[in-house]
Amino acid sequence: MFKKWSKEQKFIAAIVLFVCLLSGLSFLFFRIFSGEKREVKVLKNGKSLLECSLQKDQKFLIMDEEVKEVSFSEGLSSLSEEERNPAKHEVNFIEVKDGKVSCTESNCNNQICVHTPPISKKTADLPIVCLPHGLIIEIVHS
């Protein structure tokens, strides 16, 4: 039914098997040790407002179309009443911590962005969206 392989056929099969094994291992090695870099990108109405590292813990205040890095203790309560007023300003606090990003506070009317769980490398497929403010927070390859 099966005929025996000649020495030449065995040698060629061994080389093909070795090349396949080597390419598979090199792919795995590259995938594991490449340290795939990802960063946070914040868009407002399609315009890029912020790009920052996912590795560094930091907090940002986004008011209208201006971005400012703030301390972790700051929030909506640290702003003036006029700045918090949703009729005058669109305010979001974005926090990058422990490799995750979240919208911790917002003065939008539905608060969906605040109640959306933090996103990380593992859940990077799903962005955080604040529809009333036209804000999209996503994790992208750098």
Enumerate the language-model features and the residues they cover.
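Short extracytoplasmic/periplasmic juxtamembrane "stem" segments immediately C-terminal to an N-terminal membrane anchor
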Residues: E39-D57
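Short, Lys/Arg-rich N-terminal segment immediately upstream of the first membrane anchor
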Residues: M1-Q9
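Aromatic-capped interface at the extracytoplasmic side
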Residues: S23-K41
